[in-house]
Amino acid sequence: GVPVEVLLLGDPARLRGAAKINWEILGRIGVTRRTIRGKSDWERWLRKKPRIRLVLDAILGTGLSGPVREPIRQVIGWLNRLPCEVVAMDLPSGLCADTGRPLGAAVRATRTVACAFPKAGFAGARRYTGRVVVADISFPRVLRP
């Protein structure tokens, strides 16, 4: 009974692979999808949402190899100012999984749902991860750290 919206930071026409398939599935099953291309889109969306209860951060993942660039850096700043719970999927966006240091900017989550196991850098990164919960995704035990 809770309304859900999925925000895409960028142009849906540029999506490829699983991201494109999942974006299309969301549309087919009736999930509200919004495209955020900049500050004006973000501010327009916020004005329409008087009470945001929860944000699920799944912007960037473990493949991030350099500093967070604009416009994602700006969006992370906006997320960090929202007065609601922020749950990061696997890793807060912008956080280095190995060191726990932000790569220019990082989401400050209240909770992180780590897939299979906590990342090596989580030990000193509670400011960004919040409470860490491990989700079993059937990762073979032999491959776990």
Q: What does each model-identified segment do?
A:
Residues 51-145:
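YjeF_N-associated NAD(P)HX repair module
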Residues 1-55, 60, 65-70, 120:
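A cross-family phosphate/adenosyl-ligand binding-site feature
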